[in-house]
Regions:
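N-terminal cap/lid segment of alpha/beta-hydrolase-fold proteins
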Residues: 27-58
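Short beta-strand/loop motif that positions the catalytic acidic residue
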Residues: 222, 228-230
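Alpha/beta-hydrolase active-site loop
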Residues: 115-138
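The serine-hydrolase catalytic nucleophile loop
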Residues: 72-84, 98, 240
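Catalytic active-site module of serine/aspartate enzymes centered on a nucleophile-bearing elbow/loop
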Residues: 265-268, 273-295
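Conserved alpha/beta-hydrolase "acid-adjacent" motif
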Residues: 235-242
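Conserved alpha/beta-hydrolase
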Residues: 86-107
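Primarily recognizes the serine-hydrolase "nucleophile elbow" in alpha/beta-hydrolase
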Residues: 133-187
Length: 295
């Protein structure tokens, strides 16, 4: 099932930059703004979310990207390869253990049709706590905090942006435009390998089940720039259904929303013809991000 699948394009690239930056191993004293790279524990009510802040070697203050992972039991170590993409561009990275995993407290639950309307907002509340924390960090620019939501994380990112005036923009990859119910239905249909992407997309009109979490309201309310990236050969998430929903909202609500389609890319961001990662994927994201950061 798509909801049990982890998608991390930074892992696909497979390049890990080893940092020599000084780590913040000692806890921050009370009432003192956090500073430096390293591990931080962030409170969200009774829950503690633990993550790592990676900083560039150039002088700050820095913009910072919060990586919101997809589904599955993913901890921050899976997102470490993002360092090699962001840090050379002067962009800091915050990666974290999901609630109930790694060093984060609470109970971990897989998202499904029945619990998604509760768990997606719950995960957004954890990210919102991270945003609020990073806005106080001495080495970061509080006006240049942005979110990367991949797969399931693409449902989370708009919710966070709508609840904070600290989020500058969001980037979403292979997800976030359709309801949980539609995505699960599509994923199940796609088990039939004889059906084409266009046939699978057309069959979504037959879905009459429960929606589960539906992102429509969050997308309509979104008021920050957003970049969506999709693979045209994705058999886990309904790319063309998603794009149709996003285009409709863009036109009706006059949103600053950019959609990039990589025609031969699958859910794992691999070109199905070449078996390789698209070399234009990250350069296009960096260029768009820098345009929003004014760099």
């Amino acid at each position: 099932m798509q909801l049990q699948k982890i998608l991390n394009p930074f892992v696909v690239v497979g390049v890990i930059l080893i940092l020599s930056a000084c780590k913040n191993d000692s806890p921050t004293p009370p009432n003192e703004a956090p500073k430096g790279a390293g591990d931080f524990s962030i409170k969200n009510g009774d829950i503690t979310i633990t993550g790592t802040l990676d900083l560039p070697s150039t002088p700050g203050p820095y913009p910072v990207m919060i990586f919101i992972p997809g589904s599955g039991r993913e901890t921050r170590e899976a997102d470490k390869p993002a360092q090699s993409v962001l840090l050379p561009q002067g962009i800091a990275l915050f990666r974290y253990d999901k609630r109930g995993l790694g060093q984060s407290t609470g109970a971990y639950q897989n998202v499904n049709l029945q619990n998604s309307a509760q768990l997606i907002p719950e995960r957004a509340s954890d990210v919102l706590a991270i945003v609020n924390f990073l806005a106080t960090h001495q080495d970061l620019n509080p006006k240049q905090i942005f979110l990367w939501g991949t797969s399931q994380g693409a449902w989370v990112a708009p919710l966070v942006a709508n609840q904070s005036n600290q989020v500058a923009f969001i980037i979403c990859v292979n997800g976030g435009g359709s309801s949980v119910g539609i995505e699960i239905y599509y994923d199940g249909l796609a088990d039939n390998a004889s059906l084409s992407i266009s046939q699978l997309t057309a069959m979504l009109a037959n879905y009459t089940g429960a929606p589960g979490y539906d992102p429509a309201a969050a997308l309509q309310a979104l008021n920050v720039p957003a970049l969506w990236l999709y693979g045209g050969m994705d058999r886990s998430n309904p790319t063309f259904y998603d794009i149709a929903q996003l285009e409709k909202i863009k036109q009706e609500r006059n949103k600053d929303l950019t959609i990039l389609l990589f025609a031969n890319m699958n859910h794992d961001l691999i070109d199905v013809n070449t078996g390789q990662f698209d070399p234009e994927f990250f350069p296009k994201i960096i260029a768009w991000s820098k345009s929003k950061l004014g760099k």
